[in-house]
Amino acid sequence: MIENNIKMKNIKNSIIPLVSIIILNYNAGNLLTNCVDSIKKTNYDNYEIIIVDNDSNDSSHLECSKKFPEINLIENKENSGYCEGNNVGIRKAKGDYIIILNPDTLVDPNWIKELILSYEKNGDGLYQPKFLTTTDHRTLMSTGNMIHLFGFGSSRGKGEFDDGKFNEHEIIGYASRTCSFSKSKIFNKLNLFDPFLFAYHDDLDLCWRGALVNIPSHYAPKAIVYHPPEGFSFKWNNFKF
């Protein structure tokens, strides 16, 4: 606890900024409630949770809102896709920082603090944490997305044992939208996600547009987020296509 307090004092101007956590939901079932439950155990107090529901028919968003009435629930009248669904949340967000988070994730209690500390140290950009599997917390899911020689995106380190090889901050090819973190001004500068894509490759597109205007993608390894080996939207595959 003392170490955490010292770290927080290192944040610029000793101001604890508001963080908006945006979770896009579409029939995620109990995964959504479990995700929010893990967020509630975060060692950071100044945040808001915005759940954007893309016209689910499994009542997962209603059950989550019932258990956590303090969340801000936005119910879209139709499935507007991953990109525009998250854009709805970004437009409603009040935070200095924004986190885009998938509903099938669980978070480490220090994740927000470590993301902010990395951002304050390394500057503007699009950030991702270290992803470990929910099954054993020791197998890597991603330590940064990279662009293959032939143009394909891949998740570096996926399936490898976390032996400490990827424990340093790095500039990466692009940040995963499983959990993507930046200041609200950066998302707005990039005109948010491109709704033309609907879903998939949206993270590569956003970060590519960022790189073109000198907004790099960063890997923040001290921030930890857990993700299933086979995610809610993806099957186990090292490649992003």
Q: Where do the PLM segments sit?
A:
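Acidic helix N-cap motif at the loop->helix transition within catalytic regions
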Residues: T33, D58-K66
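Short, acidic, metal-binding catalytic loop of nucleotide-sugar glycosyltransferases
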Residues: D37-N46
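Glycine-rich, basic loop-to-helix element that forms the pyrophosphate-binding segment
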Residues: E75-A93, P103
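Short aromatic/hydrophobic "clamp" motif used to bind/position activated sugar donors
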Residues: I98
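Conserved donor NDP-sugar-binding/catalytic core segment of glycosyltransferases
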Residues: T105-F152
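Short, flexible, basic/aromatic active-site loop/helix in glycosyltransferases
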Residues: H148-I172, N188
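A short, conserved alpha-helix in the catalytic core of glycosyltransferases
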Residues: G173-I224
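Active-site-adjacent helix/loop segment of glycosyltransferases
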Residues: V213-F241
